[in-house]
Curated annotation (Swiss-Prot):
Task of the protein: Catalyzes two activities which are involved in the cyclic version of arginine biosynthesis: the synthesis of acetylglutamate from glutamate and acetyl-CoA, and of ornithine by transacetylation between acetylornithine and glutamate.
Protein name, UniProt field: Arginine biosynthesis bifunctional protein ArgJ, chloroplastic
Organism encoding this protein: Citrullus lanatus (Watermelon)
Protein family per UniProt: Belongs to the ArgJ family.
Signal peptide span: none
Length: 460
């Protein structure tokens, strides 16, 4: 399968096969940018929005850049990214629940407590700067202070994300030396967003970026985002970083609540391997530049807030699904939809349980329609339901109903799984646990031999 890549001049194309996925990877012949990744497929549903180009620079007021600063242990793939806003942007963040939180996570939490706005997000790949003590935290402070002088903004308006090897401090000298060029490279173009999306990746085989345009309260708004993640992915965030930008006009308290709701419906609903990272961070910025005539969204219960929430959900879920699709060693995306629960939260909990089951994931990789594993994972989710109302379908093939196995074409079910694996498509599992109105989704991927190989060889 060949995925499309954006146009860049003077490109040298090569092809390689990795974990049963054929990708066309291209490298720019200059030293400024090399070893670009292909883009993940766009995984957003149809709706009252339009998918557009631009990622984090699609919304008005935002610029981005990515370059190689010498932070990675190998190669010259971009490893340093910067996203900036021309104005003070309303800021929000969501972070790992891991108590061994990385230095940049601790810093961002404090910065968001101090200021309701931010102007920049600095991201490095190569070193996680987690479990690095006070020295690692001081590295963050020094990098922020240096960047604030170059950008001429307050230090507390700069947020930081890091990804890479735990226990390794940032290569501070390399980062500091790269900051002037990084700032000079800032662009509101699609290319600026694309280079930043590549720079934040680690074991990812694709970059993840998406943007949409929609109507909110009579104004045209844009929301875009980028994310990274492939392994160490589990609910309560994952080893994933994300930046989301919008030009919607929204109050800080409402925006921060919206972001947490969307994170719970997206990044907290994906799982690859059951490991919760030390560095999970999603930063969301709102420039408010969609229109000076727009009324500010000041109530979470307003019609306009509902429209913006839906758009934010779509972007974050699109990025989250791209992460699961790109799971280390994975051959397919798995989408679990649970209905009939008493609440959305209970449905989401059951969906997460099934998506995270190693036995379910292994069965899907083996193209085995083993509905018993699905039923068992639903049952141990910690959500009470009447097992006599349990219903399980694989695609449009009914496997279990009324708590009992159903007669089905096993060959057809196995072929459904096989086709998804051969084309890196989506396996859809539908579960009903009762008569309630609660519905929730979770996403994961199958578990292959390659997952063990990748992580056995990864430097720790």
């Amino acid at each position: 399968m060949y995925l499309s890549v954006p146009h860049y001049p003077s490109l040298k194309f090569t092809a390689f096969q990795s974990h049963k996925r054929n990708f066309r990877v291209f490298a720019v012949a200059t030293n400024e940018a090399a070893n670009y990744l292909p883009e993940a497929p766009i995984l957003i549903p149809d709706g009252p929005w339009k998918q557009i180009d631009g990622g984090v620079t699609a919304a008005k007021g935002f610029k981005a850049a990515g370059l190689y600063g010498g932070l990675r242990a190998k190669g010259e793939k971009p490893d340093l990214a910067l996203v900036t806003c021309d104005v003070d942007a309303i800021s929000a963040g969501a972070f790992t629940k891991n108590v061994v939180a990385a230095a940049p996570v601790l810093y961002c939490k404090k910065a968001l407590d101090i200021s309701e706005t931010a102007r920049a997000v600095l991201i490095n790949a190569g070193q996680a700067n987690a479990a690095t003590g006070d020295a690692g935290y001081q590295d963050v402070i020094e990098c922020v202070n240096n960047l604030s002088k170059i950008l001429q903004i307050r230090p507390e308006e700069i947020l930081v994300e890091s990804t890479g090897v735990i226990g390794h401090r940032i290569k501070k000298d390399a980062l500091l030396n790269s900051l002037p060029q990084l700032v000079r490279s800032l662009s509101s173009s699609v290319g600026g967003a694309a280079s930043a999306a590549v720079a934040i990746t680690t074991t990812d085989l694709v970059s993840k970026s998406v943007a949409i345009e929609s109507q909110v309260g009579g104004s045209t708004i844009r929301i875009g985002g980028m994310a990274k993640g492939s392994g160490m992915i589990h609910p309560n965030m994952a080893t994933m970083l994300g930046v989301v930008t919008t030009d919607a006009v929204v109050a800080c308290d409402v925006w921060r609540k919206m972001v947490q709701i969307s994170v719970d419906r997206s990044f907290n609903q994906i799982t690859v391997d059951g490991d919760t990272s030390t560095n999970d961070t999603v930063i969301a910025l709102s420039s408010g530049l969609s229109g000076f005539n727009s009324n500010i969204i000041s109530s979470l219960k307003s019609r306009e807030a509902g429209q913006l929430q839906e758009c934010l959900d779509v972007v974050m879920q699109g990025l989250a699904k791209s992460i699961a699709w790109d799971g280390e060693g994975a051959t397919c995306l798995i989408e679990i939809t649970v209905s009939g629960a008493s609440t959305e939260a209970e449905a989401a909990k059951v969906a997460r349980s099934v998506a995270g089951s190693s036995l379910v994931k292994s069965a899907i990789y083996g193209r085995d329609p083993n509905w018993g594993r699905i039923a068992a994972a639903a049952g141990y989710a910690g959500v009470p339901f009447d097992q006599m109302k349990l219903k399980v379908s694989l695609g449009n093939i009914l496997l279990m109903d009324g708590g009992e196995p159903q007669s089905f074409d096993r060959a057809a079910a196995s072929n459904y799984l096989r086709r998804a694996g051969e084309t890196h498509d989506t396996v859809r599992i539908f579960i009903s646990i009762g008569d309630g109105q609660g519905e929730g989704r979770a996403w994961g991927c199958d578990l292959s031999y390659d997952y063990v190989k990748i992580n056995a060889e990864y430097t720790t």
